[in-house]
């Protein structure tokens, strides 16, 4: 397990007694008190999940919207700030590079959330398509933590 990456919350999970397991190259919490109890908590109240293993990429600049539309299957044109989209990045032949979430953070500013197991591949693919677009692309995966709050 020496090669496993750890999220910024890893030690907190260990200290709280989480059952840890490899997932996407990270040592991640799988459960605390039991799957059934945790499932019921999410279905009836609220669950908090450490998703810090996911990859994050900032896209900013005058061509940010145009660039995101170029690499992403959904049209983000004119989306309000705060809007989130789920879709895919595709190869020119139609094969899937990866699925991802795209958030509009501001005018000419988008935030991409990519899958943990594909961070390096996806970032390289995104960077390889920036030519001709006036954008800044900033991989943030090593500097952010991320929590997902889920429930009814």
What annotation goes with each model-predicted range?
Residues 1-152:
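Basic, glycine/lysine-rich polyanion-binding surfaces/domains
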């Amino acid at each position: 397990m020496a090669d496993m990456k750890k999220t910024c919350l890893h030690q907190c999970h260990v200290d709280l007694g989480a059952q840890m397991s490899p997932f996407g190259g990270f040592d991640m919490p799988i459960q605390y008190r039991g799957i059934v109890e945790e499932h019921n908590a999410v279905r009836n109240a609220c669950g908090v999940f450490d998703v810090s293993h996911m990859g994050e990429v900032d896209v900013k600049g005058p061509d940010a919207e145009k660039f995101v539309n170029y690499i992403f299957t959904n049209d983000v044109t004119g989306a309000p700030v705060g809007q989130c989209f789920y879709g895919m990045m595709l190869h020119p032949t139609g094969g899937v590079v990866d699925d991802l979430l795209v958030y509009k953070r501001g005018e000419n500013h988008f935030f991409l959330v990519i899958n943990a197991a594909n961070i390096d591949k996806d970032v390289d693919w995104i960077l390889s398509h920036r030519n001709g677009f006036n954008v800044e692309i900033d991989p943030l995966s090593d500097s952010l933590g991320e929590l997902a709050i889920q429930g009814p």
